[in-house]
Amino acid sequence: MDSDKLFTLRTVEDTFRIKEFVDEHKPKSAVMVGGGFIGLEVAENLRELGIDVTIVQRPKQLMNPFDADMASFIHSEVRKHGVKLALGYSVEGFAERDGGLDVLLKDQPSIHGDMVVLAIGVTPESTLARDAGLALG
């Protein structure tokens, strides 16, 4: 989908586009698709700007590599800061509505936001470290 309200987050330039949109349009709500390190960081920054944030994550926990006990602690902290969680839901698409975007979920009602950020499948760029002979985990 081509929409000025839908953002991917893979590069520094993507961050600048998100910041420009927030400064210019003053969104009241955002849906973050992805609950890994980057998704949580962006959700935190958007909340600090007073934006209502919902994180949608296909696995039933944030920070999927963590064990369930640690994830439970993270869920509690995130909720304490006003972030809503929609865990265990698959995103099937997006639809423009009411000046924002609906995030269409499989077998669930859609979630509406003034903007949507996709922070999924992001892995660190490690080519330079690998070429330098550094050990990678």
Feature-to-residue mapping (PLM):
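Conserved beta-strand scaffold positions in the cores of enzyme catalytic domains, especially
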Residues: 6-8, 85-86
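Phosphate-coordination loops involved in phosphoryl transfer and adenosine-cofactor binding
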Residues: 3, 24-29, 88, 97
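Rossmann-like NAD(P)H-binding beta-loop-alpha module
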Residues: 13, 17-66, 100
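Rossmann-fold NAD(P)-binding glycine/threonine-rich loop
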Residues: 2-3, 12-14
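Conserved SAM-binding loop
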Residues: 7-8, 32, 55, 118
